Amino acid sequence: MDEVISGYRTVTGKAPVMPKWAMGFWQSRERYTKQEELLSAVSEFRKRKIPLDNIVLDWQYWPSDKWGDHNFDSVRFPDPDGMIKTLHDQYNARLMVSVWPKYYVGTENYEAMNSKGWLYKRNVEKGQKDWLGFVSTFYDAFNAPAREAFWDQINTKLYSKGVDAWWLDATEPDMCSNLPMDERKALMDPTALGPADEYFNA
């Protein structure tokens, strides 16, 4: 068996051991709507002496009409740097943030990605709205420069603040999950690698 495992590692490469905190308890819910709600949840875990290593901040931490700009809503999350510092220093907890390859039409990052031709066009051309009522699209993650731009966006706006982990959400990509599969593929066609029929959910 050791030979099989070592042979597999030869093919895949050596996997680094995750940090100890990543193996502990993670608290997650549909979302925390504001900074004080998230900090209060962690505080309550500590008061009750329930072990907690990571808390997940799911979607809609951004302004409601700015999906894809990767900014915290300044009303609901007035001090994200302070929030993350409190999690780290006062509560010895880590923060995971969900990020999506999705952009609302007209946002700053949408315009930047669109100007390079890195966004799928069909959903915008059809004026198809998401479940919150906005027209959006996804970037082509098969395109290497687009991936670099996406990383630069989330690194500058989020990781640099001290975010510890990413939840890379909707990477299927899930523009409209209730549509027939042929239309879902058409929404992301073509990719930088070729037809969506071949690379959908790759």
Language-model-detected regions and their locations in the chain:
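Catalytic-domain carbohydrate-binding cleft regions of carbohydrate-active enzymes
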Residues: M1-A202
